[in-house]
Amino acid sequence: MNTDVISGKKTGSKSWIRVPLLILAAAVAIFAVAEMYQRIQLWRHTRVPVLSNEQPGPFRRDNTLGWAPRESYKSAYTRSTLGGTSYPVRYSVDASGLRGCSTNGNGRKILVVGDSHTHGLEVSNDKPYPCVVARDLKASAVAYAAGGYGTLQERMALERFIPQVQPDLIIVQIGYDDFINNDFDLEKASYINNHNMLRPYWISGQIRYLWPSHFPSGFEYARAHSRLFSNWYDSLLQKKSMREQTVEVDIAKAGAAYPGFDAATTATREVFGQIKALSAGRGLVVAATELSEPYHSAFRKIFQDLNILVIEDAAVALADARARGMDVYARDNIHWSEAGHQIFGDALARGILAHPELGFK
């Protein structure tokens, strides 16, 4: 006899799932409304299409480089120095994503690749250090760079733009974070230099595209397809970066003996060997932005082995200016103000002029 009767009516064997299904349907509806709200708000402020998963701003996803400057992008905004001085910024790149300088020079061309220090979002057109160098050397210059670029991405950019620009001099900007960004395991263990995007790595003699995520791949898929999840995810990463010890702290303590540092050094050396080959017949200069250890010694050994000219004077000049109390950093205390770019560019130009074989005088 069936005893599953309430008020004389049979409930049925599947009635128990109705409440969970209703709860799930309500949760999906709430999520959909919140997601659409986020997308509409983004459209209102940036004009990114409501149904697009593209991130707004000066960079876009790129199948080869991982991410790249958004072509023909223009923007005007306000930035502040670390000392609190506000100033207007007018930013633009051309149809190739190159940030150029208004100097015409004497016909000699400079191509600069690097990371966010080279891209110079904190300063207006003609203010980034590549333009300072171009003016000092009476040359023309263009730069292709993006925040978080590692040495392999810079090599790929050179492959793309050397035929187009036909530069007389190539400048590759370096920083300690290149070692982190050149190695998958080190970047995955980092919270301050992890850009949480699919990117190319040079591993065992070949290019591999990997995502240095702290979370399972499903999180990354959801982040790429949901504005709501992306905002939550980024907030979670920011909180973790404030709590967790990052790999850079461990490397500072252990030095070059830190597990994995050798692999990063090997990859960096091999890719710079490729850059030297790409630059054959042209001037090649490496511009150091800072000289912290153990990265500085590793870089110096690489460039000695490959016979590549590295100029450290600009990093020294910038550090000296800061020690004297000059307001050379932007509010984030990472990137440079207009004064910082000017000091770095002037010192780099003097370093280039000290080597007449580069053809500038």
Model-derived regions, located:
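N-terminal Sec-pathway targeting helices
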Residues: 9-27
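Conserved, well-ordered alpha-helix/loop/beta-strand core segments that scaffold catalytic motifs
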Residues: 169-181, 234-319
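Membrane/wall-proximal cationic-aromatic binding patches
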Residues: 42-135, 139, 317-322, 327-328, ...
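Histidine-centered active-site loop/cap adjacent to the catalytic His
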Residues: 20, 33, 330-361
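Short beta->alpha junction loops
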Residues: 143-151
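Short, intrinsically disordered terminal tails adjacent to the first/last structured region
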Residues: 1-10, 360-361
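Interaction-surface signature
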Residues: 43-61, 152-256
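Membrane-interface motif at the C-terminal end of an N-terminal transmembrane signal
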Residues: 30-46
